[in-house]
Amino acid sequence: MEDHNLEEFRQRWQEELAHSQVLRRRRRLEAGERRPRRPEAGARGEPASGYLGLAQGLLEGAGRPPAPRPGRTDRKDVSSRSRSPPDRDAAEPEPLVDQLIRDLNEMDDVPFFDVHLPYELAINIFQYLNRRELGLCAQVSKTWKVIAEDEVLWYRLCRQEGHLPHSRFSDYTCWKLILQECLAPVHLIRPSWMNRKGAVSELEHVPDAVLCDVRSHDGVVIAGYTSGEVRVWDTRTWDYVAPFLESESEEEDPGMQPYVSFVRINSSLAVAAYEDGILNVWDLRTGRFPIFRFEHDARIQALALSQEKPVVATASAFDVVMLYPNEEGNWHVASEFEVQKLVDYLEIVPNTGRYPVAIATAGDLVYLLKAEDSARTLHYVYGQPATCLDVSASQVAFGVKSLGWVYEGNKILVYSLEAERCLSKLGNALGDFTCVNIRDSPPNLMVSGNMDRRVRLHDLRTDKIALSLSAHQLGVSAVQMDDWKIVSGGEEGLVSVWDYRMNQKLWEVHSRHPVRYISFNSHSLITANVPYEKVLRNSDLDNFACHRRHRGLIHAYEFAVDQLAFQSPLPICRLPRDTVAGYSYDLALSFPYDSI
């Protein structure tokens, strides 16, 4: 009985196995009919599966991998969308020529962007792209290339990057090529920066005075001295004779003049504030005499000048005054603000529209001063005075000093001018932050200097210190950066140039007095060493001329000497042959008199 049951079980098992093999073979045949690229498997009678089927598909498709197998629910949609419906009865592979034609037809499909967007709307979208992004878009398709190489886009890029600001769109026919020509000298100047290859000039000093303050704008330098004199240089032309800007007090009282406390300059105006509270404003285009004079009752503690508009802000005692001309061109007091403490730092916010906006720090108070409005407190924490200040078009950055371990060290606070709230708290250093630069820094980056002798590069997106450089022997007094380098000045008189991408110091120069001012552009650098003491020191009591080492220094570095050599020779090369002054500069010049 048991043998009979066992035999019956074996027979049923063999029938089920045979039936399952028939079903499996039928399914494979149906699948082979649905896919016309691999019909040989059904013709051979043994369907290929797994890795064997993949290899056969690669061989039959001439190196092209087989398309993924569609699901059961998508097979009807795929067959309905195909360009040529598959022949279920065909058993031969598709010719390679037909496959090539079908692939070319698929490449002719136009992207959605090209079909549905008008050309004018595409231009408006592409105007927010930079040079690199436009180059990438030109590689997408022919239509995108036409849009990405539109002359209007490259004309706007050329203007945004500061090239040919006074040119019109009709002046050139290929603005992309013009931008390439404008950028070519920049790539040639960078090696000169890295190797300190160029010309250095020490601006002529007033012999009987000590340097008090220095500022510059687009190569034009202004300096004030203890003798009350204000001098202007144009470093863009080597043969420029620096004039003195005269004041009305010199004509009234020809004796000892008050010290110059602050000087400021922009493209058209020069401003100087004196120790006795006098403020003079000169128009650089009209003459050497001031066009406006304003007098405070007390000493001027801070001075600011807008770089775009004729707007001047001064702080004296507990008052902050904004001055600018009216519609007739007459200067007047436009706004006056009262603050609770003496002002330490004062800056005018750029690009504010009709009404100018200023930022003032007074002890532990930071004020937002808008013309035609009252003073508003932007920041206040008792016992945390501000130690430095800088502003950009949308943000203000200032260092705060922490008194005690509770506040976790000194920081730099970044505020939004539009929202009037704190965006970032950066730093956490033991020393006081002595300088910060957000106006000239690349987007989302900021550089600062500290009394702990370190220069810090801050990433505003992460609120972290991206780089920290041990730059100076004493505290850092001035700092500025661009897209690849940092230039810093220290209290010991050292000017250092860093390539922060490689975390490497390129070169440095040293002078006697602290570095109080640094400004550079793509091809030039201006530094000023201002002494601590403003008193004349000389061993000869009968001679009031100040010794050279106590005056202070202003240096102008030019790294595009090859370009300037065709415009005018250097001053040392214009000396006559019978003088020996040309050999006292310790410069390795080859044939300095060949240009005569």
Swiss-Prot record:
Disulfide bonds: none annotated. Residues 111-157 form the F-box domain. SMART domains: FBOX, WD40. The keyword Cytoplasm applies. One of its GO terms (biological process) is positive regulation of dendrite morphogenesis. GO terms for molecular function: ubiquitin-like ligase-substrate adaptor activity. InterPro entries: F-box-like_dom_sf, F-box_dom, WD40/YVTN_repeat-like_dom_sf, WD40_repeat_dom_sf, WD40_rpt, WDR55_POC1. WD repeats lie at residues 199-248, 257-297, 298-338, 339-381, 382-427, 428-473, 474-511, 512-559. Pathway: Protein modification; protein ubiquitination. Gene3D superfamilies: 1.20.1280.50, YVTN repeat-like/Quinoprotein amine dehydrogenase (2.130.10.10). Keywords: Acetylation, Cytoplasm, Golgi apparatus, Phosphoprotein, Repeat, WD repeat. Component of the Cul7-RING(FBXW8) complex consisting of CUL7, RBX1, SKP1 and FBXW8; within the complex interacts with CUL7 and SKP1. Interacts with GLMN isoform 1. Interacts with OBSL1, CUL1, CUL2, CCT6B, PFDN5, CCT2, CCT3, CCT6A, CCT7, VBP1, CCDC8, ARF1, TRIP13, PDCD5 and GORASP1. Interacts with MAP4K1/HPK1 (when autophosphorylated). Associated component of the 3M complex. Interacts with POUF51 (when phosphorylated on 'Ser-347'). This is F-box/WD repeat-containing protein 8.
